[in-house]
Amino acid sequence: MHVSAALHPIAPDAYPLLHPLISDEPWAVPARAVVLAGLPGVRVDDARAPSVVAIETAIPEGQSVFLFGAADHPALAAYIRALTGPTTLQANAALADHIPIWRPDASVRQSVSFTFPLSDTDAAFAILPPGGVRRLRATDARHLTAFPAWLWAGYGSPEAMLRHGIAYARYLRAELVAIACIASTTERYDAIAAYTIARTRRNGFAWECTHRLLGAIRSERGKFPLLTASAENDAAIALARSLALTARHDQTVYDLR
């Protein structure tokens, strides 16, 4: 049997073949979301019978690559060694330990994701009344210019995010002080990007704002919200836990520069 030594782009109409390879786990949500949405950036060894997959997504710092498959496939080592420019790498357990071998120049950090436990999902999360919260429309894009661009990184612009995605805002005294949007989605999870302005955080309202926004998204969607942060971001971790997102998932991330 011929084994390809390279990874090639695959047409979206063949993406269903990839579903068994890309698990619906918290760390892999951005990758599975690409496949479910039929977006470009997917490479495989064999379009007819894929066994390894690389999914490339744009991020503000460069690109993020998610890898799935077996470590002994020759195409993976060649693909990873050929990567250039700022890149973050994440991989399934069978591959992750091989990345430092293939790319000894990679730096290592830890990422952590939080969601509801699979049992008793709503037991500790009481949805607050939606006071001061509303779903944003495409015409609201002009109000987001002061917010960080990573909120809509997966869409390219705030206008695109509001046209194609879901975002809610929290208002205090008619001022937009917090936003939460769905960065990517799978059958089970909604990965949430959320931000509260500095003054509102200093005044102690970050928890209340994020709680109301998560409640609005969950009421509409019914999926498991997923918050991801650096493992060193103690404030984000404390916020996630205070919101009853107590199921923790750790993932090693490799950075190439």
Predicted regions and their residues:
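Acyl-donor-binding surface of acyltransferase catalytic domains
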Residues: 29, 38-42, 46-138, 254-255
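A short helix-loop-beta-strand connector motif used in the catalytic cores of GNAT acetyltransferases and
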Residues: 34-50, 159-169, 190
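Conserved acetyl-CoA-binding loop-helix of GNAT-fold acetyltransferases
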Residues: 73-79, 196, 202-219, 237-242
